[in-house]
């Protein structure tokens, strides 16, 4: 697993044409943030900003995970989503 593989997975995700659920988007987002920035380091968003709050909470779940582990999981999740793509 390398930085190049991670970047390729990031590019692949942008090319997906099939539907991706909000839950899947949040999960992939959380691993992307952990892989690129490490533990969540932003203030808690206001409860009124539902989207930002959901993203924050998803990222916080990965607290303590190494960037390399997050990259591996991100790549695996993107591969799962690619397999769901319509032919």
Curated annotation (Swiss-Prot):
Compartments, record wording: Cytoplasm
Cellular compartments per GO CC: cytoplasm
Keyword Transcription part of the UniProt annotation: no
InterPro entries: Acyl-CoA-binding_prot_CS (IPR022408), Acyl-CoA-binding_protein (IPR000582), Acyl-CoA-binding_sf (IPR035984), FERM/acyl-CoA-bd_prot_sf (IPR014352)
Gene3D superfamilies: 1.20.80.10
Xref: SUPFAM superfamilies: Acyl-CoA binding protein
Record has Zinc-finger as a keyword: no
Entry comment describing in which tissues the protein is expressed: Exclusively expressed in late spermatids and spermatozoa. Not found in epididymis, spleen, bone marrow, skin, liver, brain, heart, kidney, muscle.
Entry keyword set: Cytoplasm, Lipid-binding, Transport
Function: May be involved in the energy metabolism of the mature sperm.
PANTHER family membership: ACYL-COA-BINDING PROTEIN, ACBP, DIAZEPAM-BINDING INHIBITOR-LIKE 5
Name this protein carries in UniProt: Diazepam-binding inhibitor-like 5
Organism per entry: Mus musculus
Gene from which the chain derives: Dbil5
């Amino acid at each position: 697993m390398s930085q190049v593989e991670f970047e390729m997975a990031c590019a692949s995700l942008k090319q997906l044409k099939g539907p991706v659920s909000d839950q899947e988007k949040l999960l992939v987002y959380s691993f992307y943030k952990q892989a690129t920035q490490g533990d969540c380091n932003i203030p808690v968003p206001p409860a009124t900003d539902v989207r930002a709050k959901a993203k924050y909470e998803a990222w916080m779940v990965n607290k303590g995970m190494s960037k390399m582990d997050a990259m591996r999981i991100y790549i695996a999740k993107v591969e799962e989503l690619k397999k769901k793509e319509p032919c």
